[in-house]
Structures are given as structure tokens and as C-alpha cells.
Regions:
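Bacterial N-terminal signal peptides that target proteins for export
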Residues: 1-12
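Acidic/proline-rich low-complexity IDRs
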Residues: 12-15, 47
Length: 145
């Protein structure tokens, strides 16, 4: 190798090292405010029975595998809140196809989630940040006017 090539390689490696050294860590503040994974499991322990008890929500969830849904929601909330989880199934439109979910249905689910977050003592600011991260999903979930 020529001296010039060696210098370019050295400069490139130094640049890569500098970029790696300045990489921003994942912001897991919201995840921690929600109590981490144990807090999310506790939230779902409160949320799932409320969904089933709610007259408007019950038809959507009565035939769903509750344990599987709970695990997926914990993973989803973990991921969107900055936790270490990765949701493998991301096609929300496909998952909700055939359920005839209106904007009112979606909003009711959010209300039930807020009740659970209140019951768990999750600070209002953390609730708002979580809901802001989840809100864009309505475009893939709501499938009837």
C-alpha cells in the first residue's frame, strides 16, 4: 500500500471512531417513567380487564388470546417508550383488518388506557408523551369512517 492510501484509511478510521464516540444513546426516560418492563406489565394487568369489561371494547377483545395480546402490548409500549424491546410484528393495518374499527372505537380504547395509567399512578406528563407516540398508529388501525 502506498503512504497516501494508508493515510486515507487512517483518516477514514478516525472519522468513524469520532462518529461512534459521539453517537447519542437511546432516550429511555419515558420507559423508565412507566416503570420499565415491570411497570408496563402492571399497566397491562390493569388495562386488559378494563378492555374486556368495557361494553364498547369487549366485542373487539373477547375472542383474542389475552396472554398473547398482553405480551405484544408490553413489547409495543416498551419499544415506543424507548425501552430495549423490539416489536417483530409491525403491520398494524393487517392485524386490525376485518375488525371495523372507527375513530370513536380508537378514542374509547385511549380513554380506557388513560384510566389504567391513572390507576397505576403514571404521571400525566408521561401519559401524554406515551399517547403522543402511540397516536400516529390510528392511521393504520382505524379502518371505517
Amino acid at each position: 500500500m502506498t503512504t497516501r492510501t494508508t493515510r486515507w484509511i487512517a483518516v477514514a478510521l478516525l472519522c468513524l471512531a469520532a462518529i461512534a464516540a459521539h453517537a447519542q444513546p437511546r432516550d429511555d426516560t419515558l420507559y423508565r417513567e412507566l416503570g420499565g418492563e415491570p411497570g408496563l406489565v402492571a399497566l397491562m394487568d390493569d388495562f386488559m380487564p378494563r378492555l374486556l369489561a368495557d361494553a364498547r371494547m369487549h366485542p373487539f377483545f373477547k375472542e383474542v388470546d389475552q396472554a398473547d395480546l398482553k405480551a405484544k402490548l408490553v413489547t409495543q409500549f416498551c419499544q415506543v417508550s424507548g425501552g430495549p424491546c423490539v416489536l417483530k410484528e409491525t403491520d398494524m393495518r393487517k392485524k386490525h383488518d376485518g375488525f371495523d374499527i372507527s375513530r370513536g372505537d380508537f378514542n374509547r380504547l385511549v380513554e380506557v388506557l388513560q384510566q389504567s395509567m391513572d390507576a397505576r399512578g403514571i404521571p400525566f406528563a408521561a401519559q401524554n408523551r406515551l399517547l403522543a407516540k402511540l397516536a400516529p398508529m390510528h392511521r393504520e388501525i382505524v379502518n371505517v369512517p
